[in-house]
Amino acid sequence: MVVTSNADRICTGITSSNSPHVVKTATQGEVNVTGVIPLTTTPTKSHFANLKGTKTRGKLCPKCLNCTDLDVALGRPKCMGTIPSAKASILHEVKPVTSGCFPIMHDRTKIRQLPNLLRGYENIRLSTHNVINAEAAPGGPYIVGTSGSCPNVTNGNGFFATMAWAVPKNNNNKTATNPLTVEVPFICTEGEDQITVWGFHSDDETQMVKLYGDSKPQKFTSSANGVTTHYVSQIGGFPKQAEDGGLPQSGRIVVDYMVQKSGKTGTITYQRGILLPQKVWCASGRSKVIKGSLPLIGEADCLHEKYGGLNKSKPYYTGEHAKAIGNCPIWVKTPLKLANGTKYRPPAKLLKE
């Protein structure tokens, strides 16, 4: 190829304009380049969403209206329903709210943690059978107590499905008793964890004598999976309290739970006022849990505790560093850029003779 020109001299080189792109390199420090691809984004806060490609759990029982997660976990009447399986869960109650029904001394035990424990499982179901025959338990015979403060689906007196309020049936066994022990068998399917809820009731001296024949503080112990917990009941001193428009109650209940691993038996040692386990939670698999808020709107690649639902537009992000689950960008302290051009060189100058 022949090139002709009237110019005094032909110069070859890189044609370039002023470059606004600066990248930091490992060997040469800051370098101007002709082009870059941004690799980071700084998210803005958004609502939480369903995680793409998997089921995301918000409330434990979405169809249980006007129920807290603790209501569902305890089996409160009118709060019974199916808990959908989920591989990801939103911890929307960092400190779960109280349950209604009968007044509970929530802060004496770890019972507030029960909804969050259940949330950490992929599959959760309530057993169809009772784990203990409460009427025939040691220290009986018993009748199963109910309360007008805990109405069932027909608006009759009810109680939590996970527990049976064991009240001595007749005057012959309404007496003080030495500690009694009942075994809690494993009734879930092999490979599942069994979460067994139990508790005890106490009242003022007059009501304790009327119900149980003993007004002294009662002792209770649970043991499962190497964990043993002891309680002593408080007698009296409670102001009357009503839950959700129910009858004012002078008594209180203390509720706890124990986790039984597959095939393992638990034990409960008790005196008067025991709330014996009934239906138990059978749980398996693991659900990734992240703190967030409801409702879940739409879908997102990633759920981030600080930013909510994120769609991954870049491989990295800057901003607040926090727990995230899903297909998430990686947190970096400073923005990253990928140079997709060449090192910037000033335009060549024509040489004059």
From Swiss-Prot:
Kindly give the Gene3D superfamilies that the UniProt entry links to this protein: 3.90.209.20, Hemagglutinin Chain A, Domain 2
Question: GO biological process: any one?
Answer: virion attachment to host cell
Q: What is this protein called?
A: Hemagglutinin
Name the family the entry cites.
Belongs to the influenza viruses hemagglutinin family.
Describe the task this protein carries out.
Binds to sialic acid-containing receptors on the cell surface, bringing about the attachment of the virus particle to the cell. Plays a major role in the determination of host range restriction and virulence. Class I viral fusion protein. Responsible for penetration of the virus into the cell cytoplasm by mediating the fusion of the membrane of the endocytosed virus particle with the endosomal membrane. Low pH in endosomes induce an irreversible conformational change in HA2, releasing the fusion hydrophobic peptide. Several trimers are required to form a competent fusion pore.
Q: What is its main location?
A: virion
Q: Mind listing the UniProt keywords for this protein, alphabetically?
A: Disulfide bond, Fusion of virus membrane with host endosomal membrane, Fusion of virus membrane with host membrane, Glycoprotein, Hemagglutinin, Host cell membrane, Host membrane, Host-virus interaction, Lipoprotein, Membrane, Palmitate, Signal, Transmembrane, Viral attachment to host cell, Viral envelope protein, Viral penetration into host cytoplasm, Virion, Virus entry into host cell
- Print the miscellaneous field: Major glycoprotein, comprises over 80% of the envelope proteins present in virus particle. The extent of infection into host organism is determined by HA. Influenza viruses bud from the apical surface of polarized epithelial cells (e.g. bronchial epithelial cells) into lumen of lungs and are therefore usually pneumotropic. The reason is that HA is cleaved by tryptase clara which is restricted to lungs. However, HAs of H5 and H7 pantropic avian viruses subtypes can be cleaved by furin and subtilisin-type enzymes, allowing the virus to grow in other organs than lungs.
Record's GO cellular component terms: host cell plasma membrane; membrane; viral envelope; virion membrane
Q: Which InterPro entries match?
A: Capsid_hemagglutn, Hemagglutn_HA1_a/b_dom_sf, Hemagglutn_influenz_A/B
Q: Where is the signal peptide?
A: 1-7
- Its domain of life reads Viruses
Provide the protein's localization: Virion membrane; Host apical cell membrane
**What Pfam families does the entry give?**
Hemagglutinin
Molecular function terms in GO for this entry?
Answer: host cell surface receptor binding
Q: How does it sit in the membrane?
A: Single-pass type I membrane protein
UniProt subunit comment: Homotrimer of disulfide-linked HA1-HA2.
Question: Which modifications occur after translation, per UniProt?
Answer: In natural infection, inactive HA is matured into HA1 and HA2 outside the cell by one or more trypsin-like, arginine-specific endoprotease secreted by the bronchial epithelial cells. One identified protease that may be involved in this process is secreted in lungs by club cells. Palmitoylated.
Query: Glycosylated where?
Result: 32, 66, 152, 173, 311, 340
